[in-house]
Amino acid sequence: MKVLVLGAGVIGTTTAWFLREQGHDVTVVERHSAAALETSFANGGQISVSHVEPWANPQAPFQILKWLGQADAPLLFRPRLDLQQWRWGLQFLIECLPSRNRRNMLQILAISKYSGEVLRNLRAATGLHYDDLQRGILQIYTDREGFDAAAAAAELVRQYGIAREVKTAAECIAIEPSLKNRQDWIAGGTYTASDETGDAKKFTQSLAALAIERGVVFRYGMTVESLSVAGNAVSGVHTVDEQHGRELLDADAYVVCLSSYTPKLLAPIGVSALVYPAKGYSATLGIVDPAAAPTVSITDDAKKMVFTRLGDRLRVAGTAELSGYGLELNPVRCEALTRRANEWFGDAVDTKHPEYWTGLRPATPSNVPLIGRTRYPNLYLNTGHGTLGWTMSCGSGKAVADLVSGRKPEVDFAFLDG
């Protein structure tokens, strides 16, 4: 079949790769000049199968209230005259119910675990390198309440085959010695040796280059404007670019991987996708003392930040701001990243020359992504992965390719079906 994939972030590029593997004629449409120049550009770098706790949990409403008015709060809700934002917020509160929280966690775990397996197979088959490390992820807790809740979550994922181990402060230091200067901060941690890290941008651009060698066409610099519908099927994609002007592209099947912009494309044809942008920040810092810098990726639960080594750089990322589609850098939130990096690893990194970045992560209220077929039989979605797009990318891409090909995906997940 002829398939159009809309978007060349890590989700769209992996989708295109697996569609091509299954024999389809694939074209990817991307508004930027290369793959991975938007949401996948400078994320936290974690491939975190074990960290599946949704933002929407029974404690979340109280935490958000506590953080109101704090410019550097880990999760910041800025109310707007935006119906989509309020619909999202109300559904988020519903997803905080204990029964829904557990169901969502199991869905996230299923697709994340599967995706980790697919990524390992893909790396073995292609030999891709992307500043990847297989050293695990260590989640640090600075208060007893958070540590106790993490221990319960770790027990749940262990029941499903993920070896997330509860660690004392001393054991955390043994796993990652660069934490030793702040041992008195640490109440405990959880560690998953099977989790990985890597540069999502490098991975995506390398995979796109391989996909081109295998026949996938990437139409860069081309913006998707709208979808055409004929009867009960999508009949084309209206695009525009500087070179060709306006163009109508047609295919047998269409896969929308447009991150936070997915709802804007779908609403005119009557397809609802409750996805809202969660603005995240990162700072990339040069490593000045490699021996003092972490090699195990660290998640600081109190500040909702991650620290990931990517070659000779340390990526610090985190926070979520529900404030619309603006990409302006907030100095307070940027400085919070470098301040925390300095507190943990000040001797190891250059915090005076950070490279700041912000991107819009496509969040659903449940944190469960939207993967599968819409009410139009030839229109598929692969979006809504929130902070776990890198983690879920390979599994999501392969699953969508299976669905387009009429195959049953190899993972037990609640795929969309009309």
PLM region descriptions:
Residues 2-28:
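N-terminal Rossmann-like FAD-binding beta1-loop-alpha1 element of flavoenzymes
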Residues 166, 179, 200, 229-231, ...:
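C-terminal lid/capping helical subdomain adjacent to the catalytic/cofactor pocket in oxidative enzymes
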Residues 103-116, 139-149, 174, 190-209, ...:
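Short beta-strand to alpha-helix junction loop
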Residues 44-169:
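Dinucleotide-binding Rossmann-like beta1-alpha1 core, especially the glycine-rich loop
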Residues 148-160, 180-252:
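Helical element adjacent to the flavin cofactor pocket in flavoenzyme catalytic cores
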Residues 21-41:
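Glycine-rich FAD pyrophosphate-binding loop
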Residues 43-46, 51, 55-95, 180, ...:
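Active-site substrate-recognition segment that forms the wall
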